[in-house]
Amino acid sequence: MFGLKATYFYLIAIQISLIKFFKKIYFTTNYYNKSLKSKIPKQIIFSPNPFLLTLISPYQKNSFKINEINVSEFWLENKNRNISDQHSFLWLNLIDRKIDRKNIQKIIYLWMLKYSSFKKGVWETSTLSSRLISWILNIDIIIDNGTFDFKNNFFQNIVTQCNHLKKNIKYEKDLIKKVETIVALSMSGIMFKEYEENFRLGIKELDKFINSYFDEDGFPLSRNPNDLIHFTKYMLLLSKSIKDAQQHVPDFLEDIIKKNLICIKLIKTPNDQIPFFNGGYENKLNSLDNYLNELKVNKKDKKNSVGGIFLAKSKQQVLFFDIGGPPSKSYSKNYQSGPLSFEYFLDGAKIITNCGFGKNISQKAELISRLTASQSTLTINDTSVTKFERNKVINRVFGNSIKSSFKTTQLNIQDDKNLTGCSVVHNGYEKNFNCTYKREIYLDHVSNKLLGKDYIFKKKDGIPIRYVFRFHLNPGLTAVKTMGGNSALIQISKNKSLIFTVENENIEIEKSIFLGGKKILENTCITISGNLVNKDKSFNWEIKKKI
């Protein structure tokens, strides 16, 4: 049975789905495709830096070799090929600019013969935007020594695809695609004098996007670290291109890029990744290294939390702790239900982890990775703190958004010469189980160890609950339960180990799975579990080096 809010989202989803259905039919008509044609630019007004494509391209060196491909067969339909991979042209950053020029021109010529009019998949918003950006950044080599007809046709194809984006940008609800569209349109506007209005439109839309989607620190309201990385890369690409064109970079764009980079620098882990909270998965940051190294973070910019992630560091230890509530439904399609979960590093090695977002593996892996049991935190009666939307119509439009919420309160931060950490409470289990959960977690600078204290506050209602605290170990680490039953030996390497200990409780060692990469990995999980009726309970635990 739908509640009022669910009914609203359902009706909106129905409306958007119907509009998309009829628009896709309309897009395939000759009338629509003719409407996309407009004035062909005479020339480009600046040569962009093609190496900026490395900011957004997922391709690594030697992963795509043009000279080993039969160019004439490049666009033959092949079920084993990913349409987005081919048609995005993000692989252009791998070409040998001296050897591959002729082949690139032929590949694009054949593409224009086959795909100049709208085709589902090939003209999907993200793929199309990436293609435009890739073409524009490599435009010098693409048109070099090309015939007049080839240049004209190529320019016309850029304009046609830009016009398609312009006609539909106001209907785009996916914020990732929105930013990609904005950057593609803006770059076309600084490339062609005849289409300067594209630049003005892009900057106007970008200003609105930034004002509505980032908090005061520059962190996305989705609380997703991967969103932060994605948006930063695209906005950096645009900013650098504007500078290369010797045009003024809007102050708001420079301001948000600086804030974004500060956030990334603060949450960057010792293994050069992002913490696995709220949609985070393995994401190489090497394309941002130069920008991060150049960035100087002033004292006023140093914060103990960004995006609802608490940060604590000592000489050898690093802690990331999820102290925030869930994002709003509109921004929650990648949210993982792991309030008060944490990740812990010692001597540069990751010890405690969340399972990561399974987006790059499968839909099932993505669903599993969103559950509370996949995070290093408390579950009660094997349920997730946040319930997720199951209605297929709503999910098709808004993604797998949340349908229930909770609050985090009573944040208390401690930072002195002995301890750095904090305590916080969430009420996610209050409605169903009459419980609230509090976690205190600190880096002990004196003893160089991690201290934790968990509390379950249970109302006296006579209803029993089953609690489980999970501590997921990073893949590659193993754990063995000790004879006492209340501790585990965590093996890091042949000559290095840690000891996990909990007072007056038994632990168990279980198998788990890690979903933050491109394939499922097995890992180990330390658990503390039991039953509770009509009383509160606290749990004291620590992780320290084995001497």
Positions of predicted regions on the chain:
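Carbohydrate-active enzyme catalytic cores, enriched for enzymes
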Residues: D215, F219-T353, F357
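CBM-like, beta-strand-rich accessory domains located in the C-terminal region of large
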Residues: F2, T7-Y10, S129, N360-I547
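Aromatic-lined, polymer-binding surfaces characteristic
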Residues: K79-I257
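Short polybasic amphipathic segments
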Residues: I56-F64, F310, F342-Y344, D454, ...
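Short alpha-helix boundary/capping segments
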Residues: W123, L128, S332, Q336, ...
